[in-house]
Structures are given as structure tokens and as C-alpha cells.
């Protein structure tokens, strides 16, 4: 559960991401594909090369979903219900992949926002991404 301080940290950090969100989303996906090659399975129809327009497009989708989540921190299950259905029932993404992408997102944010990525912000973002992952995997049962 996100504390009031966590919510403040997440909102402030995401505000600093600003209009770089889509680029950071794409970079996190690239990091995930390089670091965890098994994740490429779900994107076999994509060009997974550096600066791929398909990866950039999906990075934007990831960023848009996270932006929506940041705006609905108190109602994540409702806000992300459609995405949860999509990933559980249609795409059937292995839940572990959300943790892998979350890790790559944290690395990307730390690389681009080093002065703002304090231990408390890191912890808050980690809790936030874990909460998003929990919601996205909630309909797998």
C-alpha cells in the first residue's frame, strides 16, 4: 500500500519524467529485451532493433498506462481494469515479465533523473510499480 509520502514521491517523480515518458518507456523495453531475452517472445512480430518504431510505440503505451496509474493512485484496480483483462486473457503475458519491466523502468529513471532518484523516491517508485504489477496480474486467477 502506498503511503501519503509514497504518493507524493511518485507524483513528483512522474512530473519530472514529463514529456520524456514515451522515450523512457521505449528505453525500458529495450533494456528488458537486452537483459531478459525471453521477454522477446511476446513481441516476435516486432522489429526489436534499437530505435524501432514498434518498440517506441509500445513504450508510449506503457508510459501512457503509467501516467494514468499515477493519476489514479487510490483507484488503481478500476483505472487499469481493461489492461489487466488484456494482459491476462488475450495476451497471456507471464506475470514475471511485469517485474522485469518494472526493474528496467527503475534503471531507466535512475539513469535519466539521477539527482531526483533518492533512496526514498526509489522505494516509492518500486512500491508503485509493484502495485501496478499486482493489478495487472490480478485477473490471472
Curated annotation (Swiss-Prot):
UniProt binding sites for O2: 58
Chain residues that bind heme b: 87
Limits of the Globin domain: 1-141
Modified residues (Phosphothreonine): 8, 108, 134, 137
Keyword Metal-binding: yes
GO MF annotation terms: haptoglobin binding; heme binding; iron ion binding; organic acid binding; oxygen binding; oxygen carrier activity; peroxidase activity
Tissue specificity: Red blood cells.
GO cellular component, as recorded: blood microparticle; haptoglobin-hemoglobin complex; hemoglobin complex
Family annotation (InterPro entries): Globin (IPR000971), Globin-like_sf (IPR009050), Globin/Proto (IPR012292), Hemoglobin_a-typ (IPR002338), Hemoglobin_oxygen_transport (IPR050056), Hemoglobin_pi (IPR002339)
GO terms for biological process, alphabetical: hydrogen peroxide catabolic process
Keyword NADP: no
Keywords: Acetylation, Heme, Iron, Metal-binding, Oxygen transport, Phosphoprotein, Transport
Record function comment: Involved in oxygen transport from the lung to the various peripheral tissues.
Subunit structure, as described in the record: Heterotetramer of two alpha chains and two beta chains.
Protein name: Hemoglobin subunit alpha
